[in-house]
Structures are given as C-alpha cells and as structure tokens.
Regions:
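Catalytic-core elements of nucleic-acid end-processing and repair enzymes
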Residues: 1-326
C-alpha cells in the first residue's frame, strides 16, 4: 500500500496549485501556495484525511526544494552501509554511561531459542534510539527529521542554519525576512523566467504507514520503514526533541540489497509540498518566546542531555560530533 498523493485539483480557499514537483526517483507531487492560516490548517487536514487508512502524516519544514529527500549522511555518498555510523552506534549502546542515561533495554543470557531473537531485537531497537539521538544532536545519520506540529515546521522553513568558527562546529539560526522592496524584486522574473524561490518556506507532508504491532518506547518498525518518536524514545533530560515535537523516519536496512546511499531517499513518502511566503510565515508565528532558538534549541545549561553529550565528546567523532548552537 502506498500513501495517497494530493491532486492538483484541491479546492481549499487560500490554496493555489503552482506546479508538479518531480523528484529524481520519478515520484511527482503537487506544490501548493498557501496564503492564509486557515488554508494551511485545512489542506494539511485534507491530506491527513486522504491517508487515514494508510498512516500518519508528518511535516518537514525546509527553506528550499531539491530533487531528493535524502538524509544528511547519505548526501554525497554512494555506499549505503556506513561503517563509520555503525561504529558510532556500537560505541554508544555499549557505553555504560549512555546505557543508563538513555535507559536502553538490556539483553538476556540466552537460555532458549527465543532468547536469541529477543536479544537481536533489543540491540536493533537500542541502535534505533542511539541513531535518533545522533540525528537530533549531531545531525548526520540515515534518519530524516520530521515533526507533528506544523508551526514548528514553519519555523524550520523560515530559518537558515549557518556554520561558524574553526572546523565549522558552531551553528546559529537566522530568521529570513522580506522587505517591501525585496518582495518587489523577488517577484521579478529572472533570465529563466522563474519566480525567485528564496522568498518561500516549504513544508513537505510526509506519510508513514501504521505499524502492525504496537510501538515500543516510541519506536515503530514496519516492513520497510523505521519511525522514532523521540519524546517517547528518549528521557526528557534530552530536552531538544521534546521542545520541537520531534520524530525521525527512515527506511529499514534490510531492503538495501545493493547497498546504495540512494536507497534511503524518502521522496516516495511525500504526499504534497506547501509553500508559504516568508513574510506571511513570520507574521503567523509572531514573536512569542516558544518559537525561538532559545526554546527549540535550548542551551546545555538547560538541556541536561545535551550537556551530557558535550561532556562525553570522545565518543562522538566527526561526522557524528555534537553540534554546538549559540
């Protein structure tokens, strides 16, 4: 069963069909321009309703569109079985400090046949948890970040993340803005007769299938995908994902027979793309402190889990070193 893609004939007032977006995989989805808050709520609700028998629909806020939806670690790689990531995950789940801090499940001494499959599953789920942790605090794994709160997705699409300092180890978010003159300039067509795309924030609506078995500690494993709700998989001392309403999703490794990086492209799960002009996004979000970097990326003085990661930096080697936000 596949997710239902929104058609180009939606009649939601305040939404205008722009064009079809074709990913390199061949998957095609519509781009809709959204001009009102009510229209945003309604068209998201419509996509959820269309996929009610398939699964949940999550949101990925981005500042630009690409021809794929590859996780960060797989961009620029050809090999789909990353030995460096596997080594990092083993280091985390075998470290006694993080076994306790992350409340990882423990294996049992095998006494019967079923114990071996139990231990294998425990190890696999512990690695899912560790990889989800790395995705949120290091930012480069096989997982893709999504949220189930569309104003957080809008915030992510409104901001650009810049690197600073030696080795580009420090990160800071910059809120994009649009003056009246910028708006006039941006609407002018360029030499290719295309409207400037830098004036928009985008939300990718990503559908994930329902599980056949109940989730365990926020982890859902289906035939082809893994989904981790970090608010359930990680203790709340790891505050950032709880502030962001964060989940991560990816394809399961077992289907990557050819061991290619492109296997992890999640474009097939995108059901629609919504674009909103950044001046509208800024107006809708307002100036509340809940939607600031200070809340969504709390400092290590507040986010105890973040501090734990920074204090154990010897485990987290490039490209899985913990990113520092300021």
């Amino acid at each position: 069963m596949k997710p239902t893609v929104l058609t180009e004939n939606s009649r939601v007032e305040g939404c205008s069909f722009i064009k079809q977006h074709k990913f390199s995989s061949g998957h095609i989805v519509p781009i809709y321009d959204v001009s009102t808050m009510n229209a945003l709520n309604q068209i998201i609700g419509h996509v959820k309703f269309q996929n009610a028998n398939y699964g949940n629909v999550y949101y990925r806020g981005v500042s630009g569109l690409y021809d794929n939806v590859l996780p960060a670690l797989m961009r620029g790689r050809t090999k789909g079985i990353p030995d460096d990531l596997c080594q990092a995950l083993n280091s985390i789940i075998n470290d006694s400090y993080f076994q306790n801090s992350l409340k990882l499940s423990t294996t049992v001494v095998p006494r019967k046949k079923d114990d071996f499959s139990f231990n294998k599953r425990v190890t696999r789920y512990n690695k899912y948890c560790a990889e989800a942790l790395l995705q949120h605090y290091a930012g480069s794994t096989r997982f893709l970040d999504v949220v189930d709160n569309h104003w957080v997705a809008l915030w992510m699409g409104l901001h650009e993340f810049k690197t600073h300092g030696k080795g580009k180890k420090f990160f800071h978010s910059i809120r994009r803005s649009l003056s009246a003159w910028d708006m006039y300039e941006a609407q002018m067509k360029d030499d290719n007769f295309e409207i400037n795309k830098n004036i928009y924030a985008y939300i990718l609506l990503v559908a994930m299938p329902y599980p056949e078995c109940p989730p365990q500690y926020g982890i859902i494993e289906t035939a082809n995908f893994v989904e981790v709700d970090l608010r359930k998989a990680l203790p709340s001392i790891y505050l950032r994902p709880h502030a962001q309403h964060a989940l991560v999703v990816r394809r399961r490794d077992k289907g990557n027979i050819e061991q290619k990086a492109g296997y992890y492209d999640m474009a097939s799960q995108v059901t629609a793309i919504l674009r909103v002009r950044i001046d509208r996004v800024s107006n809708w979000l307002g100036e509340g402190t809940l939607l600031t970097q200070g809340n969504l990326f709390p400092s290590p003085s507040i986010d105890q889990g973040y501090n734990n990661l920074l204090m154990n930096s010897e485990i987290f080697k490039d490209p899985f070193d913990i990113k520092k936000y300021f």
